[in-house]
């Protein structure tokens, strides 16, 4: 059974500030500033040296923390048109060489496995772009060989999603594999943070409204495109970090193959009996499903979207492209930030985040 949130806290600014004594909402709202700081740090790290390189493979490393979410999002953004093979793995493969590019992120300066991977990749001549703290074994393994982008803004562990994504996208831009306007990305993240500011009440605050929709439910985060599904993975990560909600994440076609869960979703979004008494339910107490259909790419005629709209008429559709004019990477980042702030609002209201219970990686 999930913790019950105090919904009234979300619009009581004084109590919300008191609950957020660690300044977690402010840390999350620095996403746009992270993009700008990372852009400057990447230039100083010498990412331009990747220009003109035609890599044999791009290796995306998924170490614990943000690594899996970042890697899968970058892969999803690249996959439609990228001519270079993408490898998503927990450790750098033994076959990497001078024609390969390795992208890695960690909040843990003492990640021994990553340190060994970075050392091996650099020794074999691979081009390594690493986003990590500038002290500790991981940074030491990169010294003089890898391109180390150390975060310039101090945020708690797990709050550097914008830094990690920006670092990877800038590396891909240098390789000529992806186009990203970092300044526009930062500006849109600033706008989203402003829309979601604690001073705005729930009915005009997208993150608070999302938090209230998720409260006391089991979120089914079903993507209508690969990028949206990747953002759903990150949403599940932040919800598990700041709340005790358990989510299901899948692309919609895959979700349809989960027949029992999909049937429950159909029932939950079809209206049902609005006069039904929940006390008449004979079975174990359970949080009802809340179906959120996520869309990043603007494809109104897409088969998945049409099928989902017909099958799940009452599902919530969250599509940033219908709210802002931006590219896929920016829409994905905006959606990710909204989920992060929603998770924080929900966690603060339920008392499941803040204080000593937050994740802290091992120190060097």
Task: Tell me what each language-model feature is.
Residues 70, 160-167, 231, 235, ...:
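Catalytic-loop motifs flanking and including active-site residues across diverse enzymes
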């Amino acid at each position: 059974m999930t913790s019950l949130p105090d919904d009234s806290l979300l619009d009581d600014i004084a109590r919300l500030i008191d609950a957020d004594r660690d300044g977690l909402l402010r840390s999350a709202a620095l996403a746009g500033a992270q993009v700008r700081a990372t852009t400057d740090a990447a230039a100083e790290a010498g990412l331009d040296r990747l220009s003109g390189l035609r890599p044999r493979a791009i290796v995306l490393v998924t170490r614990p923390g943000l690594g899996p979410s970042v890697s899968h999002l970058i892969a999803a953004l690249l996959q439609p048109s990228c001519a270079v093979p993408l490898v998503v793995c927990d450790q750098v493969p033994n076959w990497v060489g001078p024609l390969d590019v390795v992208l890695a992120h960690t909040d843990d300066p003492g990640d021994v496995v990553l340190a060994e991977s970075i050392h091996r990749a650099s020794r074999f001549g691979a081009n390594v772009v690493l986003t990590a703290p500038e002290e500790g074994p991981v940074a030491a393994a990169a010294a003089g060989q890898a391109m180390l982008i150390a975060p310039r803004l101090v945020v708690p562990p797990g709050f550097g999603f914008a830094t990690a994504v920006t670092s990877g996208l800038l590396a891909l831009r240098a390789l000529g594999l992806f186009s990203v306007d970092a300044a526009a990305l930062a500006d849109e993240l600033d706008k989203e943070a402003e829309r979601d500011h604690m001073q705005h009440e729930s009915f005009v605050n997208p993150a608070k409204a999302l938090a209230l929709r998720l409260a006391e439910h089991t979120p089914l985060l079903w993507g209508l495109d690969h990028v949206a599904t990747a953002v759903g993975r990150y949403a599940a990560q932040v919800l598990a970090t700041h709340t005790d909600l358990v989510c299901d994440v899948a692309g919609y076609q895959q979700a349809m193959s989960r027949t029992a869960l999909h049937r429950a979703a159909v029932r939950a979004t079809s209206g049902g009996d609005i006069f039904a008494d929940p006390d008449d339910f004979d079975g174990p107490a359970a949080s009802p499903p809340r179906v959120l259909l996520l869309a990043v790419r603007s494809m109104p005629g897409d088969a998945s979207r049409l099928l989902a709209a017909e099958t799940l008429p009452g599902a919530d559709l969250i599509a940033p492209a219908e709210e802002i004019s931006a590219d896929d990477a920016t829409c994905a980042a905006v959606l990710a930030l909204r989920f992060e702030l929603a998770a924080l609002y929900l966690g603060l209201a339920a008392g499941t985040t803040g204080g000593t219970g937050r994740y802290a990686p091992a120190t060097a």
